[in-house]
Amino acid sequence: MKQDLTWGWAFGCVAALAIQAALMVLVAPWFAGWVHRLAGRLVGEPRFPAGGRWQEIWHQFRRPSLYGRQDGLNGIFCALALVLAVLACGLVPVFTLTMPGFPAPGMLLVCTILVAVGVLLDLPQAVQEASAAQQGCAAIVADALLLPVLTPVLLLTGAHDLVAFLGRLHVLSPITEGAPYVLAGVALFLATALARRDEQTASATLSGPDRAMWLLAADCMQMCWVTLAADVAWAGSLAMPGESGAENWLTQCVEGMGLWMFKLLVASFMLAVLRMALLPAGRRARVRLGAIFLLGVLAWQVTSSHVAAPSAEPENHNVEDENTQGYSTEPAPEGEPS
């Protein structure tokens, strides 16, 4: 039995959102370091341990910044990117949804914030000179086109917010009714899987806290895309507050956290394999945008066909009623022809 939104449940939802945001920010550099190390193992190259990413970020935070003539706005770009990335970490569900009636963002808002983070991360390279600026501008165009390409995926949510949309998918099986949403999740996953920023080039002009904020924002953005894709592909792992008591909800949260770690493990192997593909930046951007759009269109068409199919049944029943309207199923009286 579903419960109404009370002050106790509202406080629990706020605490869950804060824990989820902090968990994603803490795990994001570890996840990026693990993917980097795993990709190196697949190609036979020695890489730093997974915890080396946090060590690099902490080391850069303690270093002084070295500014050039074009580096005056880099600190603002990196700070804004980090703020938006942390905000996105608080908007993407990790192990639980919020109560119905609790304020929740829409899929369009979450994707817009993540695209804005990607554009801000490209700006430090775009303000440089010569070929570095060209690569940065090309990256900005590729990231800016990501939001229109995601239109078919955004159409699946309709007018619902993200929590209501995932709550509707919670009861669907990923193999049968939820298969189109698995395609939508794969499309969201490709948004980060085929991005593959060259960190050494994109952040080459950054140093000190600016570089640390850039690295942390990039890791948080990657974590948000991966988690959002996993939620859309399999929303059944998320806890549903209000359906039972608080104790059962806390148990579901612990289970959801374990399933989230499992989904991250699967995503890390997929990212490591995809990063072995050697494609030029321009071709990789075209493949990325094309694959996301085609998967989104396919998922939207399959979902539309499933929704339109049941609507034809009442018409058939009406036709049968019209055909049988002049006939009576009662037995005829004795002496009268039936």
Each PLM stretch: what is its role?
Residues 2-338:
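Alpha-helical transmembrane segments of multi-pass membrane proteins predominantly involved
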